[in-house]
Amino acid sequence: MKENELKNEKSVDVLSFKQLESQKIVLPQDLFRSSFTWFCYEIYKSLAFPIWMLLWLPLSVWWKLSNNCIYPLIVSLLVLFLGPIFVLVICGLSRKRSLSKQLIQFCKEVTENTPSSDPHDWEVVAANLNSYLYENKAWNTRYFFFNAMGCQEAFRTTLLEPFSLKKDEAAKVKSFKDSVPYIEEALGVYFREVEKQWKLFNTEKSWSPVGLEDVQLPKDIHRSKLTWFLKRIFTIYSLPLWLAFLNCICVSQHFCLAFRILCPGLFFLMMVWLFQNMRTTALLVKMEHKMQFLLTIINEQESGANGWDEIARKMNRYLFEKKAWKNEEFFFEGIDCEWFFSHFFYRLLSAKKSMWLLPLNVELWPYIKEAQLSRNEESLMKK
């Protein structure tokens, strides 16, 4: 009995120690007022910033010795406005270079701490890497990653996507050299954790729709897709875009007829494109939303266009309840929902390189294939 009590006390001590240890995790987001102040601090501590400041010394001498102030003024303006761009580019390249030299350590941290797709799981990895990079003089501050999401994003862009897109072993060795076995082990750990998360989500965390009979699709409410679209873009958030659009119309009045038609037309098409991609911030940022979308597709019994209408109706309610969207009009209809799945999920399976501002969702590829297969099977069964 006493031995059992001692074991229980030890286990409690270990648990309490782990809880205290997790509470001690301090990231830059806990120290700085915002990501902007952290970013300014990182810029200030970079090598590029003092170089930019030193450029003003010869300019000051030139101003003093020159009889003609026009040329010094032009150069000063160039340094003033192009200098910050130079500093930002150099800092970005330095961060990328520093992290690329520490891929093995990055992989070891992932393997040891077994993070899943939940950003909170990456806090320990981010904190450990911040300390490691500073102590080993790979970075000049203790604040390489601002938060856990920054660390997770670095894992996605530096390891997960580039490595997964390499189809053969030779290409992997050529790009990642000695890091290949460490990356394979880290990705294996990560994929297993995501699989656990998927199974848990499928059995316990999956959202169940209630009162769907009251949910109408926007196609049943609005006269046309154009009126639905215009209603959504006429908001306070899109006011700067509309002001720019009106300015474009006013400026184009001074040019020929073709330009007056072409310029506002292209600007409006750009706004449509921005609107289509704006929805990705609601559905594609959180992993739980993406998993729910795929589960809804897989579990939908109705086939064809009616099936996609049901999926759209369920997701409209889900995103509204989760406060990811301001109303129940995320998808206009089933066709719009099918297009969204095809464009932002299924087509990524054939991607050959990383996409700008759009994750490839490599960890969800098996479930995306399952979702597509379930829709194809439903269509075949109907035929």
Swiss-Prot record:
It is found in: Membrane. It is a multi-pass membrane protein. Pfam families: DUP. Residues 1-42, 94-232, 276-383 are cytoplasmic. The keyword Transmembrane helix applies. InterPro entries: DUP/COS. GO terms for biological process: protein transport to vacuole involved in ubiquitin-dependent protein catabolic process via the multivesicular body sorting pathway. Residues 64-72, 254 are extracellular. Belongs to the DUP/COS family. Present with 815 molecules/cell in log phase SD medium. This is Protein COS5. It comes from Saccharomyces cerevisiae (strain ATCC 204508 / S288c) (Baker's yeast).
